[in-house]
Amino acid sequence: MTGGAQELLLSRIRDVPDYPQPGVVFKDITPLLADPEAFSVLTEALAEVCVRHGATKVVGLEARGFILGAPVAVRAGLGFIPIRKAGKLPGATLSQAYALEYGTAEIEVHAEDLTPDDRVMVIDDVLATGGTAAAAMELIRRGGADVAGLAVLMELGFLGGRARLEPTLAALEALLAL
């Protein structure tokens, strides 16, 4: 991705201080999504990552990973699979629990959506601690598919997600490092 494309994306991400709690600066991507040029640049860049790494399907993580992953899959000519919070998918699912700062959470996928022939690219808006991404990759592997990698719009490097994920991940690409 060119420097001009990165500048465009950065210019459309709004910092919201003290949200969702005091001391946190939330990275709001809604201005980027509202700008068709910026959203197209983002979609194209993530689709190129999928193609370059030989992905056959795209997984989007609830919730903003859905917003990014579905158009990326269409642009790359790939299928899209949502990974959702527990209890949100009907029918048979595989689930994976993971630790949060205070407690645990669980995500699910439809087992029949993954096959041994699949190379799955996980798409999300941000890489922070890597907990959700690690759980998603474990879930994909348990479903019998291969993980092609993780691609995100932005990485919050100070939270250590890359160090947590790199030992078990073939590819980890962040379009923006913040």
From Swiss-Prot:
One GO MF term attached to the UniProt entry: AMP binding
Pfam families for this protein: Pribosyltran
Cystine pairs: none
Keywords from the named record: Cytoplasm, Glycosyltransferase, Purine salvage, Transferase
Pathway: Purine metabolism; AMP biosynthesis via salvage pathway; AMP from adenine: step 1/1
Keyword Transmembrane carried by entry: no
Superkingdom as given in the UniProt entry: Bacteria
Family: Belongs to the purine/pyrimidine phosphoribosyltransferase family.
Function: Catalyzes a salvage reaction resulting in the formation of AMP, that is energically less costly than de novo synthesis.
Family matches, as HAMAP family: Aden_phosphoribosyltr (MF_00004)
Protein name: Adenine phosphoribosyltransferase
Annotated source species: Streptomyces clavuligerus
Recorded name of the encoding gene: apt
